[in-house]
Amino acid sequence: MLNKKEQSELAEKFRCTFKDNSLYRLSPSSCMDESTLRMQLLWIQQTMEADNLRAAASMLAKRYSFVVVAALYSFIVFQKKINASTKNVSLHTEDAETMWLPKVFISETETKEVTEDNQKILLDELLDELFAHHIEPIWSSLHKVTKISKLTLWENVAVYIHWLYDLLLANEEIENVQVQKNLRYVLEEAEGHHFGSYHHNPLSRYSSPPPYVKKQKQEIRVRQTCCLSYQTGAEETYCQTCPVICKPKKGVIVHE
């Protein structure tokens, strides 16, 4: 079970909550129903001042990625596998704001202890729970409703997993070897079936080492697809890793 300290840490780092104080609840099952999903996307579009439903879909995918990094953080740092099933996790909005930063509501805090003997088995179980039976069905619905490419949606998740990777490697209290082993497995080595009906891991295409970007004067893992965040809000702003500003002349996929 997640103790109070661990719950507090997940709340601080990944906007997790363990109390239902929501004004607006977005459940996985509702995201898998196309008619309900369309209504939810219209609400997100209005709230975030998005230009279209495709941009709203990408923002939903980015917010949903916090479910993934919270579960992976618990697995690696606490050595506890949380229940990341569709029945135990949902996005809760506690106040209306343009940025729309919902919290990850985790209903039951029961966990499975990760040991050296069961680590591989439990990590595969977590990936099945997170991706094959949870994220992938939502991505499929988003694609059907808005025609957004799954390449964009999977890259949204990959970006946050790489962010978690960097966050953990910078923490001297955490064993780097274990971090690298687990996240390399998730990003590159895990078989495609853990993510849905895939022959290959859909995250692996986004795991190349970050190149040096002369324009930004630093190494940046430039996105292959645009997340469309510049199509939200009153001002047109771009992510630092945006392909539109980092490599605008190389056939970048903007409207996936």
State what each model feature region is.
Residues M1-M59:
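Generic N-terminal leader/targeting and pre-domain segments
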Residues L26-E34, L53, V145-S149, E175, ...:
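General structural signal for secondary-structure boundaries
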Residues S27, V68, I161, Q231, ...:
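Generic short alpha-helical hydrophobic face used as a protein-protein interaction/packing hotspot
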Residues M48-K217:
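Hydrophobic, aromatic-lined core segments that form the binding pocket/scaffold
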Residues F78-Q79, P248-K250:
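Secondary-structure boundary elements
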Residues R223-K247:
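Local cysteine-cluster metal-coordination motifs and their immediate loop/turn environment
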Residues K250-E256:
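Compact nucleic-acid interaction/catalytic patches
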